[in-house]
Curated annotation (Swiss-Prot):
Region (Calmodulin-binding): 392-406
Recorded name of the encoding gene: PPP3CA
Modified residues (Phosphoserine): 469, 492
GO terms for cellular component: calcineurin complex; cytoplasm; cytosol; dendritic spine; extrinsic component of plasma membrane; glutamatergic synapse; mitochondrion; nucleoplasm
Site note Interaction with PxVP motif in substrate, residues: 352
EC number(s) recorded for this UniProt protein: 3.1.3.16
Effect in UniProt of substituting residue 288 to F: Partial loss of Ca(2+)-mediated transcription factor NFAT activation
Activity regulation (record text): Activated by Ca(2+)-bound calmodulin following an increase in intracellular Ca(2+). At low Ca(2+) concentrations, the catalytic subunit (also known as calcineurin A) is inactive and is bound to the regulatory subunit (also known as calcineurin B) in which only two high-affinity binding sites are occupied by Ca(2+).
Active site residues according to the UniProt entry: 151
Organism: Homo sapiens (Human)
Entry's localization field: Cytoplasm; Cell membrane; Cell membrane, Sarcolemma; Cytoplasm, Myofibril, Sarcomere, Z line
Region (Catalytic): 56-340
Pfam families (alphabetical): Metallophos
Tissues in which the protein is found: Expressed in keratinocytes (at protein level). Expressed in lymphoblasts (at protein level).
This protein's name: Protein phosphatase 3 catalytic subunit alpha
Length: 521
């Protein structure tokens, strides 16, 4: 019979258990490592370090952000960009997919790029996207261009994840520097004198390209007006087959700005001698969407590009970039890349494990308190009169019930932690409805977003349900597409009606019959 194997005294409790997952580098890159002798960033070193989840010294991060901002500040509201060019849509903090984008679209060293905004929020690697793109902007200021998206603002980054990410990975100083840099981003680009490129779309207050050039962009985007519309507006869902002749209608999905119609786009294109509008702002199952062709040019009047594959890790969509060269437009699609895992909302492992500890502690407390029987309680209270003794006994019972209720809450948190996080992720505040945890497992499983936002209910949703389609994911995430509440006043319906009447009186009565196009001829 063999002797039991002795425990290796050299076994370290600090060694990484799963060695296949490398530990992020603890060393933060210095200015000497990131910048060469000419002050230009070494983007290859930066890329390799960021892909390992490495970080920079705070002063280095601030230098990249501020130097990039100084270049952006010198650019015009409306950029003039020549072909060939590769146009990219939303990134949303998906840094590892951004690296795949550059593989598909071509190296920034010899490829002209135009990004349409939304570099941050929702994904867990937003600051990496900003640092890398800003470093590329410093290195290639004349061939890499960045526009502003609706998420490049204080209001949304505080509401969603970017501010929290900056504070966890760097500091609030880095976040504030990013906000100042976002204020410098141009609003639009005129590509090859043929295409207007923006993040969202048109505005009833923008009739010519000069209207864009005249805007004051160096500020936090307002809740309404032309700057807001450029960043927030969307085409109508039935674009090209509208049942109304109105050019602009209130955007009920976003809670701000407008939906614009096919006649509105065609009139704008004809008035400004343009071929099409390129925009981002909306997730697409195929990574892109081409809308109804213009009757005068035969070219799609509107094209949407979305460059974040498997958006939020649940949409299961493809991403795409648009390459335009020699008057030929090609769409290149790509799928998502593996990325490191973060607990939801940047939760640390101690917070994650707290329900397990809490359940056991409360369970022990309940067991200790339940050792005392009713007879023992009665014998200890012989010195009190009947009313006082009964009151004391009821107080003790209530305390036991309260701890028992707390034990149930921790039990639910432990058993249903994934369900809790799923539900929190579907609410704009990241908070659960009151009473869900104390109601137990059944209450949690039947909880819906309707309990949090009645007007945006997703009826019948259960965390155990697996999302199986792009449309289902988009529907569940719909509440997060809205502009968060803010104090700015919105224009009245009367103003909107007067705008539409003026536009309708000027239109040439464009025929609204036709079908959407998915190919360019």
């Amino acid at each position: 019979m063999s002797e039991p194997k002795a425990i290796d005294p050299k076994l370290s409790t600090t060694d990484r258990v799963v060695k296949a997952v490398p530990f992020p580098p603890s060393h933060r890159l210095t200015a000497k490592e990131v910048f060469d002798n000419d002050g230009k960033p070494r983007v290859d070193i930066l890329k390799a370090h960021l892909m390992k989840e490495g970080r920079l010294e705070e002063s280095v991060a601030l230098r990249i952000i501020t130097e990039g901002a100084s270049i952006l500040r010198q650019e015009k509201n409306l950029l003039d960009i020549d072909a060939p060019v590769t146009v990219c849509g939303d990134i949303h903090g998906q840094f590892f997919d951004l690296m795949k984008l550059f593989e598909v679209g071509g190296s920034p060293a010899n490829t002209r790029y135009l990004f349409l905004g939304d570099y941050v929020d929702r994904g867990y690697f937003s600051i990496e996207c900003v640092l890398y793109l800003w470093a590329l902007k410093i290195l290639y200021p004349k061939t890499l261009f960045l526009l502003r998206g609706n998420h490049e603002c204080r209001h949304l980054t505080e509401y969603f994840t970017f501010k929290q990410e900056c504070k966890i990975k760097y500091s609030e100083r880095v976040y504030d520097a990013c906000m100042d840099a976002f204020d410098c981003l141009p609003l639009a680009a005129l590509m090859n004198q043929q295409f207007l490129c923006v993040h969202g779309g048109l505005s009833p207050e923008i009739n010519t390209l000069d209207d864009i050039r005249k805007l004051d962009r160096f500020k936090e985007p307002p809740a309404y007006g032309p700057m807001c519309d450029i960043l927030w507006s969307d085409p109508l869902e039935d674009f090209g087959n509208e049942k109304t002749q109105e050019h602009f209608t209130h955007n009920t999905v976003r809670g701000c700005s407008y939906f614009y119609s096919y006649p509105a786009v065609c009139e704008f294109l004809q008035h400004n001698n343009l071929l099409s509008i390129l925009r981002a702002h909306e997730a697409q199952d195929a990574g892109y969407r081409m809308y109804r062709k213009s009757q005068t040019t035969g070219f799609p009047s509107l094209i949407t590009i979305f460059s974040a594959p498997n958006y939020l890790d649940v949409y299961n969509n493809k991403a795409a970039v648009l390459k335009y060269e020699n008057n030929v437009m090609n769409i290149r699609q790509f799928n998502c890349s593996p990325h490191p895992y973060w607990l939801p909302n940047f939760m640390d492992v101690f917070t994650w494990s707290l329900p397990f500890v809490g359940e056991k502690v409360t369970e022990m407390l309940v067991n200790v308190l339940n050792i005392c029987s009713d007879d023992e309680l009665g014998s200890e209270e012989d010195g009190f009169d009947g009313a006082t003794a009964a009151a004391r006994k009821e107080v003790i019972r209530n305390k036991i019930r309260a701890i028992g209720k707390m034990a149930r809450v921790f039990s639910v948190l432990r058993e249903e932690s994934e369900s809790v996080l799923t539900l929190k992720g579907l609410t704009p505040t990241g908070m659960l409805p009151s009473g869900v945890l104390s109601g137990g497992k059944q209450t949690l499983q039947s909880a819906t977003v309707e309990a949090i936002e009645a007007d945006e209910a997703i009826k019948g949703f259960s965390p155990q349900h697996k999302i199986t389609s792009f449309e289902e994911a988009k529907g569940l995430d719909r509440i997060n597409e809205r502009m968060p509440p803010r104090r700015d006043a919105m224009p009245s319906d009367a103003n909107l009606n007067s705008i539409n009447k003026a536009l309708t009186s000027e239109t040439n009565g464009t025929d609204s019959n036709g079908s959407n196009s998915s190919n360019i001829q």
